[in-house]
Every structure is written in structure tokens, then in C-alpha cells.
């Protein structure tokens, strides 16, 4: 039984090596187009200054309010 698990683990590691997993440093920046533009969320009509987040249209305004 243990040898079967060892063979299965070896096959899985050969098919999906750990180097294929991206680390946090390799992740692309989320919404890079919004980061390059000078968009102030404080002036957005959907920004709620009390909650300090956007209540609607989260693809335009960041950060989104939790539902």
C-alpha cells in the first residue's frame, strides 16, 4: 500500500512540479491599468466616505465594500 502511494506521489510530482506554482513575488499586479492612471477614489461618485470603500461599480472604483 505504501509503495503505491509513493508511486502516485512521484507521478504527481513529475506531472505537476512545484516550480510550476507561481509565488507571491511572481504574481502580476492586480488591475495594473488602474494603477498607472491617476484615479482618485475619493472623488468617485460611488465612493462612500463613511465606509471608505466603493458601494457600487467596483470595477471602476477601488476598494469595494463587502456585501
UniProtKB/Swiss-Prot annotation:
InterPro entries: 4Fe4S_Fe-S-bd, Conotoxin
Propeptide: 21-50
Signal peptide extent: 1-20
Localization in the cell: Secreted
Disulphide bonds in the chain: 53-65, 54-61, 58-64
GO-annotated molecular function: ion channel inhibitor activity; toxin activity
Family as reported in the entry's similarity comment: Belongs to the conotoxin M superfamily.
Name of this chain's protein: Conotoxin TsMMSK-011
Organism per entry: Conus tessulatus
